[in-house]
């Protein structure tokens, strides 16, 4: 994928969001579907990358950067007690919360402020599509691991050789920093780690946080 096409895709997402208003797609209990930028199939496939059981009764799940909340509500549907956080109060999350009669706890909280003393600990933490929006990705991963007792599910945009032909970035633990709007014309995209860098971040974060044992951090990689 060329630099231009990568940026065009992000801009297409933004135009679609401006038109549709929803980032996530939903299917309501009565069968009504709400169309968002991301299809239901795409959302389900993202979750399927991780070893998350269909039956989550008795489990606590944290969704970091919940946005419209599909992943939060899906975890609740599977029986989990769910806490969702984001850095802003998203009215679409609250609207869907009401439509579903949900009991998910929704909090406006920065990932950097996560701590067991503040939110408790969770069997599963979802950290999906958030890392590249952060100035301090390793610190954020350490905060995620500090509240995880079993599985931290991580996916992120990664910088690959197709973005920088001839650079062999895939296997090197390097990262691009976007000072302004270099990535897709958006000022909230800060970093582009290579696949090797993402894996190294996850290993480091998991080993740095020693508050629990048996933790697994499972990263997956998306090019855009």
Regions flagged by a language model, labelled:
Residues 70-113:
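Class I SAM-dependent methyltransferase SAM/SAH-binding core
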């Amino acid at each position: 994928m060329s630099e231009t096409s990568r940026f065009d895709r992000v801009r297409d997402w933004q135009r679609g969001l401006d038109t549709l208003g929803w980032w996530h797609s939903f299917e309501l209990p009565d069968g009504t579907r709400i169309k968002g930028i991301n299809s239901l199939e795409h959302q389900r496939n993202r979750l399927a990358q991780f070893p998350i059981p269909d039956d989550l009764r008795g489990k606590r799940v944290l969704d970091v950067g919940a946005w419209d909340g599909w992943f939060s509500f899906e975890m609740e549907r599977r029986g989990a007690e769910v806490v969702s956080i984001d850095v802003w109060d998203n009215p679409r999350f609250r609207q869907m919360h009401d439509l579903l009669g949900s009991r998910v706890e929704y909090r406006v909280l920065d990932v950097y402020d996560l701590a067991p003393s503040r939110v408790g600990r969770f069997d599963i933490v979802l950290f999906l599509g958030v890392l590249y929006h952060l100035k301090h990705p390793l610190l954020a991963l350490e905060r995620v691991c500090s509240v995880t007792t079993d599985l931290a599910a991580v996916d992120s945009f990664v910088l690959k050789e197709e973005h920088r032909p001839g650079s062999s970035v895939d296997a090197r633990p390097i990262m691009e920093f976007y000072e302004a709007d270099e990535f897709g014309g958006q000022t909230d995209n800060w970093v582009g780690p290579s696949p090797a860098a993402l894996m190294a971040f996850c290993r480091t974060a998991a080993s740095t946080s020693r508050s629990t044992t048996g933790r697994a951090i499972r990263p997956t990689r998306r090019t855009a």
